[in-house]
Amino acid sequence: MDFSISYGIQNIGLPLILSSGDLKNICFLIDTGATHNVLFDFVYEHLQDDVKLTNANNRIMGIEGHYIETPIIEATFNFEGVICTSTFSVLNASDAVLNIQNETGIQIHGILGMQFLLENKCIIDFDKLQIRI
């Protein structure tokens, strides 16, 4: 299914997609430069009953460029009827998220990285400003 990313790109220069269903209105940044998926910790705190905490950790480079050990969760998100399950590193990036929100007026809740894009065989079409999941 094709989803528009035009609003985010045209208004703030970032490709964004919103989840629907039970875990709705989770705003994800689509980031082809991110190797892992990320759910920010302030969002995880509200979704703990809806996601599965794994026994694993990831060592990822945070937004500020420092390596951080993060817990890994498994979460399922609905994108207008397309159900996608993947693992996410839970990351504290409050300062960066707040800066983006202050500059753009949009709060980002997580990042869909290459892991998600490959697992779900996503195609990003920048001519049409769409992502196919």
Positions of PLM-derived features:
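Pepsin/retropepsin-fold aspartyl endopeptidases
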Residues: M1-I133
